[in-house]
Amino acid sequence: MAIETILVINKSGGLIYQRNFTNDEQKLNSNEYLILASTLHGVFAIASQLTPKALQLTQQTNIENTIPYIPYVGMSSNRSDTRNGGGNNNKHTNNEKLGSFKGDDFFKEPFTNWNKSGLRQLCTDQFTMFIYQTLTGLKFVAISSSVMPQRQPTIATTDKPDRPKSTSNLAIQIADNFLRKVYCLYSDYVMKDPSYSMEMPIRSNLFDEKVKKMVENLQ
């Protein structure tokens, strides 16, 4: 999955972070990204209202809201090599600290999907967009150059063989794992910055560097 753009949208629909990872000359300008962020915020709210009321009242008991943990999404390949019995030449990478997070990954357990009624994925003929929403309403958006096919082949699951998983769902799960790690970087390098004000644009070189490295590892 090749990520072209990362956006962070606050709970009011304002764009507080935008970063491109390609050298495309036809990329949007700053004003167009602001319009895109507010439009996504509005579409997200509309999609939430389109959810049948019966599902909202029953807390969507028939829909799984737990995202499975996918190991080492966006992490250095040397970490997984060491985990799988790699040589001593990889130990220096495995010992790199993840900010205030301990271990060789930001998390290692399934997590709750707080986006239970809004937009999670948008597929077009040119790109695919993934949206991860936090409990506080902050939205992390990843725009990928990968295009999902219209007819999705299925992948059989071991835990529930009677319910095949489409490659589209797998892509969403990978994106959710990746964007949650971007959220971990946000909580570590942005929220702990004493000079940062809530809901304001993010100006953090450390956050930029960590996000860029994670995107490069994903490709």
Curated annotation (Swiss-Prot):
Predominant place of localization: Golgi
The record, for SMART domains, names: Sybindin
Q: Where in the cell is it found?
A: Golgi apparatus, cis-Golgi network; Endoplasmic reticulum; Preautophagosomal structure
Q: Does the record bear Endoplasmic reticulum in its keywords? A: yes
User: Does the UniProt entry include the keyword Repeat?
Assistant: no
Question: Which biological process terms from the Gene Ontology are attached to this UniProt entry?
Answer: chromosome organization; endoplasmic reticulum to Golgi vesicle-mediated transport; intra-Golgi vesicle-mediated transport; macroautophagy; retrograde transport, endosome to Golgi
Q: Which GO terms describe its cellular component?
A: cytosol; endoplasmic reticulum; phagophore assembly site; TRAPP complex; TRAPPI protein complex; TRAPPII protein complex; TRAPPIII protein complex
The family database entries (Gene3D superfamilies) matched by this protein are listed as: 3.30.450.70
Q: Keywords, A to Z? A: Autophagy, Endoplasmic reticulum, ER-Golgi transport, Golgi apparatus, Transport
* Known role: Component of the TRAPP I, TRAPP II and TRAPP III complexes which act as guanine nucleotide exchange factors (GEF) for YPT1. TRAPP I plays a key role in the late stages of endoplasmic reticulum to Golgi traffic. TRAPP II plays a role in intra-Golgi transport. TRAPP III plays a role in autophagosome formation.
Q: What else is known?
A: Present with 3130 molecules/cell in log phase SD medium.
Q: How does it assemble?
A: Part of the multisubunit TRAPP (transport protein particle) I complex composed of BET3, BET5, TRS20, TRS23, TRS31 and TRS33. Part of the multisubunit TRAPP (transport protein particle) II complex composed of BET3, BET5, TRS20, TRS23, TRS31, TRS33, TRS65, TRS85, TRS120 and TRS130. Part of the multisubunit TRAPP (transport protein particle) III complex composed of BET3, BET5, TRS20, TRS23, TRS31, TRS33 and TRS85.
The similarity comment for this entry is: Belongs to the TRAPP small subunits family. TRAPPC4 subfamily.
Full protein name: Trafficking protein particle complex subunit 23
Q: What is the lineage of its organism?
A: Eukaryota, Fungi, Dikarya, Ascomycota, Saccharomycotina
Gene name as annotated: TRS23
